[in-house]
Amino acid sequence: MQIGYICTNYNNSHFTVNAVRSLVASAAGNHELRIVIVDNLSSPEHRHTLAKLGQEFSYVDVLFNDENVGYFSGLNCGIRHMRQHHPEIMHFVIGNNDLLFPIDFCSKFEKHLSLLATYPVISPDIVTLDGEHQNPHVIKSISRTREIIYDLYYSNYFLAQAIIWAARFSHPLTDRKDERQHQTAQSIYQGHGSCYLIGPKFFDLFEELWAPTFLMGEEYFLSKQLSDRGMRTYYTPSISLTHCCHGSLCSVPNKKLWEFARQAHREYRKYVKVFG
């Protein structure tokens, strides 16, 4: 099977190296890989690491952007490169660089090719280092109460910190239950943005990802891109991988990340209204 992997990198090339090596081990000579790493203007040290990785593996292409274009826009750089230079590749893993692929990942991907002929996007079972499942991210919809909390969260940074603090104590009552269905394969509203599998059906409908924001909110924007064409994401627990973050830390943004998320939330509110 031919598999493409596209990821972005920004000043954390050690994650990229580990992701590539784990995917290479999974391919184990039985699958043909083509990998595109999109660097979003990292420091010279990290660019040097990526250049060495590209020299080590002939099937790894590294694109060095002259500016940081963001997450989905960065992935689109990789998608365009793949489609132009390696059009024979039709099945892709796209997403973060801080992923680790188990030894059976490529084989399990191959067993699910029929899904990618029906669904544009597959979301795999994504598990953090401390064992939290990040999919299915949103199965049906987000409640109005939670939407109001999101508005409060993005209204003020200090209020956002207070909401995070309160959520730690109310977690058993207020946490969304969607991820608890991680053992059930099903059609879902949103898959976690750290990794998606795309294939022929996606390219029958689209040329690339819809990327209206720099960072954050990708789950919704992809779900809208799909729903506008009458499609949804499919979640399967049969394909799994590790996301190299601790679940307790993934939801605690610094101020810069919060500002990116607020910009994405404002864009999101253009399409999803709490009332009306």
Regions flagged by a language model, labelled:
Residues 162-165, 210, 220-276:
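Active-site-adjacent helix/loop segment of glycosyltransferases
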Residues 12-27:
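Short, well-formed alpha-helical segments that are part of the catalytic scaffolds
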Residues 181-184, 189-208, 212-239:
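A short, conserved alpha-helix in the catalytic core of glycosyltransferases
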Residues 66-83:
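Glycine-rich, basic loop-to-helix element that forms the pyrophosphate-binding segment
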Residues 87-100:
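Short beta-strand-to-loop acidic/aromatic patch adjacent to the donor-nucleotide binding site
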Residues 158-168, 177-197, 250:
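A recurrent flexible, glycine/aromatic-enriched loop bordering the glycosyltransferase active site
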